[in-house]
Amino acid sequence: MSTRSVTHSTFVVERVYDADPARVFHAFADPEAKSRWFTHPDDWVSDAGTMDFRVGGRETVSGGPKGGPVHSFSSIYQDIVLNERIVYTYDMHMDDIRTSVSLATIELFPSGAGTRLVMTEQGAFLDGYDDAGSREEGTKLLLDALGAALASEPAGA
């Protein structure tokens, strides 16, 4: 029998965007808008994914470098407050191996003419396949990509 392990970790990432909370919320809630920033490295291949943005709805996406392994994200939306909060649980797999299970909370606060986003993630990283440092770094990269997507679109988009 192999040795099993779980490592728990919590991290918080904050960003301020020059976009009002409704625009930032839309970037999470609308599949087309989310596809502009919630993405993978350029050299990866991925499926089209699915997104049902409502409490109890699911979102899935998978992909990886050509030739594998395949990384899969599967989430369930637990709580949604329009333009204020999104709470979801998700797990990550690498091929058929579950690597982590997480609870993520996104909070949006007005900040001048923009938005302060606070993302808190509580994760259980399983059997050494993933770690909090890598997840936090990936989250920061995604939130930076969100900022770039918001900055590249006109406010009415």
Model-predicted regions and their roles:
Residues 21-22, 53-54, 78-85, 107-116:
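A short, structured loop/turn motif at beta-sheet edges
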Residues 58-82, 86-88:
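Helix-adjacent hinge/juxtasegments
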Residues 15, 49, 73-79, 102-109:
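Hydrophobic/aromatic beta-strand elements that line small-molecule binding cavities or substrate pockets
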Residues 148-157:
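Short, highly charged C-terminal tails/helix-capping segments
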Residues 1-45:
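Hydrophobic ligand-binding cavity/cleft-lining segments
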